[in-house]
Each structure stands twice: as structure tokens, then as C-alpha cells.
């Protein structure tokens, strides 16, 4: 697993050395909500001008997730698709949560709001997938 992440990171950093967008993940609201969900999801991401996206955050199951994908932007809107780690099954109060695989597909819709002191709030919607609920997420980003 570490080798796969290292390979993805090397490929990502090796192919893009120009302007990028850096972002900070803050947290989200899950719906439907459940008591086991962690809504504080600090993390960071980088997205190249070509759309390659790589990030990490503290996830719903209180694990570190690393993701890689591609973001297609059209105006203030974005659509990201890729793969993510950190959602292997976890038993909480006798109930199993998670997807059962090391790598899970991920998709997110986003809306970048106007900049405020050099940072743009980013609203994201991650649709439900299998047993995982939908998430409305907040991040802030800055383009270089």
C-alpha cells in the first residue's frame, strides 16, 4: 500500500511543476447523520492547472485518507473523480461501516465561492456510496 501511494505521489509531483491550487480541508456534515461519524476532517490538497488532484484528510471513521484523482473545472464548479484510502471496514457498536477495500472510488461536486483575503471557500458535495452517507464539506483554497 505504501508503495502504491509513493508511486502515485512521485508520478503526481514529477509531471507537474507549475502553478497549482492548494487547499485546506476543514470539516463536513454527513446526511443522514450517525453518532459514529467524525465531522472534523482536517487535511490538505493540491490541484494542478491540468486538473490532477492529490490530498489527505482525517476521515469519517477517524482514519487518515489519501486520495488521488482528476478535477474538471467549469467556471466556479468542479467535478472530481478518483480513488481514496482509509475506508476499510470498521466495526462500531456491533455495526460494520466502510467499503471493504483498500482503494475505494470517490467523486465530489464542488463550488468555489469568491475569494476572501486571498482564499476562496470551497463547498463540496460527496454523494453517498454503498453504506457511506453523503457529505457536505467545507474547504478553503488558494491559487498560485
Go through the PLM ranges and name each one.
Residues 76-84, 142-144:
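Long amphipathic alpha-helical scaffold regions
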Residues 91-95:
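Extracytoplasmic loops and strand-loop junctions of Gram-negative outer membrane beta-barrel proteins
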Residues 29-40, 56-67, 73, 85-89, ...:
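Solvent-exposed loop/turn segments connecting transmembrane beta-strands
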Residues 17-48, 85-87, 107-110:
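Outer-membrane beta-barrel initiation region
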Residues 1-21:
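Cleavable N-terminal export/targeting peptides
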Residues 46-48, 72-74, 111-115, 142:
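Residue-level signature of outer-membrane beta-barrel architecture
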Amino acid at each position: 500500500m505504501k508503495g502504491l501511494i509513493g508511486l502515485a505521489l512521485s508520478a503526481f509531483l514529477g509531471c507537474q511543476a507549475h502553478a497549482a491550487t492548494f487547499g485546506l480541508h476543514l470539516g463536513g456534515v454527513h446526511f443522514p447523520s450517525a453518532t459514529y461519524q467524525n465531522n472534523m476532517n482536517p487535511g490538505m490538497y493540491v490541484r494542478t492547472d491540468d486538473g490532477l488532484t492529490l490530498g489527505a484528510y482525517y476521515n469519517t471513521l477517524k482514519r487518515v485518507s489519501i486520495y488521488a484523482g482528476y478535477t474538471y473545472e467549469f467556471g466556479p464548479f468542479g467535478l472530481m473523480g478518483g480513488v481514496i484510502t482509509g475506508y476499510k471496514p470498521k466495526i462500531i457498536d456491533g455495526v460494520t461501516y466502510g467499503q471493504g477495500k483498500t482503494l475505494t472510488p470517490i467523486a465530489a461536486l464542488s463550488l468555489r465561492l469568491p475569494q476572501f483575503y486571498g482564499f476562496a471557500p470551497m463547498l463540496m458535495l460527496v454523494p453517498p456510496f454503498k453504506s457511506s452517507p453523503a457529505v457536505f464539506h467545507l474547504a478553503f483554497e488558494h491559487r498560485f
